[in-house]
Amino acid sequence: MRLFLCEKPSQAKDIAKVLGANRKGDGCWQGTDVCVTWCIGHLLETAPPDSYDERYKRWNLADLPIIPEKWKMLVKPKTASQFKAVKRLLGEARELVIATDADREGEMIARELVEHCRYRGPVQRLWLSALDDASIRKALARLLPGHETFNLYHSALGRSRADWLIGMNMSRLFTLLGRQSGYQGVLPVGRVQTPTLRLVVDRDRSIADFVPVPFWTIDVQLEHAGFGFNAQWRAPEDACDDQGRCLNQALAQQAAADIGNAGTARAVKVTTERVREAAPLPFDLGTLQELCSKKFGLGAQETLDIAQALYETHKLITYPRSDCGYLPQSQHAEAPAILAALQRADASLAPLQPYLEPQRRSRAWNDAKVSAHHGIIPTAAASDPSRLPAKHKAVYTLIRARYLAQFLPNHEYDRTQADFDCAGHALRAVGKQIVEPGWRRALPEALTPAKGREAPPAQVLPALREGQDCTVQGLQLKDLWTQPPKPFTEGDLIKAMKNVAKLVDDPRLKQKLKETTGIGTEATRASIIQGLLDRGYLVKNGKALSATPAAFSLIDAVPRAIADPGTTAIWEQALDMVQSGEMTLEEFVARQSAWMGKLVERCSGMRMTISGPAAGAAPPWKKKRRGGGKGKAAAGKPRQPRKKATT
């Protein structure tokens, strides 16, 4: 029997249909000499400390660090029946095809079962990027040898064990240190969650410490040949800060008076350049979460859940947990069929049809930049998006629009910059004249990538020549204040986690971080943020995230290395080295274990002052063990709701 092992029931059903395995069995779909079974996420979990020694049931500083000599895995009680079915089928199989998600975690979900159940037969890998019938058939025709993806398993296993070492040891350590100060709650510490929390704490402190500074601007309304437009006063450099803002009120007031009295402004320099903008890349998960947060107010986890449903349930998009926006060259051959399906499914795309060029290859098609997964794009299994729930439709429309944009011309416009002299003061006007809408026909203005504060004003300038005079129609002298940094939204935090290199000063570390995925992965960032919200470290007010008092206290107490975004990003790079074979799993775990021992020794004598939940929660060792989801090392949660208090 040939056994296909999938990650979830819905995935198994889709693959079984293509294989003709239509008979429902015990935890599987059966066909002629083929069987398709499934996991329900991880069927196994890393054993808790008390599985290694009974004394670890009680939390004690003297027992730290806890470092297993031989790691144990336990069957999750909630899914034990499915584990039994998978174990039985592995015992009967003559050949195994791993068909879990095509990523590190999917590899681990399957391989840990193969190892635990001692399957020794041949292994192949089904590498799927979409779950529509055509994509499944294509992947079945190109099965990979099992050894090609084995290191993904060791990379995921290394991540899991590092999470366990830090979560179990540091959470116990800081919870016990907190108890010495009278704090009765649990203080969970994580390899990824703590640096993420520090990002928010640092941002909140920047906001709290911000001192506003006044500055002045002058907007001038000019007119030429009956055509009105706006220009801005350009203050002398010695009167401005590094952002070009005038800090001299008297100078601004004098300039406003002079400009108002002058009556005319003379054009001294006029330049026009043709600007060509390529279409934005298809989405990776992070950029999709960022834009959905900004545009729709969706949380990171909510966006991921919607994308997962569009992938698994509706079969409308490719694999969503991708960290790459590029597409393989081979995928371009499928473009005509996908474009035709999209247009058949939605009549509202008809006005776009004359402009689409299926043969066009945008910069998105680049084999050199494609990682394990390509950008998130629609599949040929398109259907009318109006039948989707409102939020699902909104997310799908974004993904579809980014794909359609790849087959439209560049967006082109003429950017004109006109400099004026007005009573000895410099003015500047910037105009934009669209020449070719191009890919913006597919993307509403609000959904295109933001260009920041330097975007040209949305105005068209009249035909101007140097030496021409324009009439001053009016002006506004504005008294403004510098603004503090904005609180993080979930989308902003996802972006900061990805681009953590920008927050690191060390040039060598910064360069290394630019080559990594930042804090966490595309698949885990949403759950990290949600976990911080669930544990009461973060609160959400509208779209804005802010840290609680307990978060400030914890970040101040933990060793800098644990809370430093640069450190955790380097760990992710080490996991990439395990994946590529440059470092062994054993070497990675040994380094983590040695580092953990040093941290425990250094921190055991600390004294803490904690703000957070009220006293009175049950001791952590009396709580029932709580199982974590993908990528989590559960360290326990207080049963009582968190309350604001200071101990």
What are the functions of these language-model segments?
Residues 1-168:
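Intrinsically disordered, low-complexity regulatory segments
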Residues 1-3, 101-102, 183-186, 272-281, ...:
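Conserved short loop/turn motifs at secondary-structure junctions
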Residues 2-3, 79, 116, 171, ...:
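Basic, low-complexity terminal or inter-domain segments flanking catalytic cores
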Residues 314-317, 536:
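Glycine-centered, phosphate/nucleic-acid-interacting loop/turn motifs that mediate DNA/RNA or nucleotide
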Residues 71, 78, 84, 91-92, ...:
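C-terminal or mid-to-C-terminal helical accessory/interaction module adjacent to the motor/catalytic core
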Residues 240-281, 566:
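Metal- or metallocofactor-binding catalytic centers and their adjacent structured scaffolds
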Residues 210-235, 262-306, 489, 511-512:
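C-terminal accessory/connector segments of nucleic-acid motor ATPases
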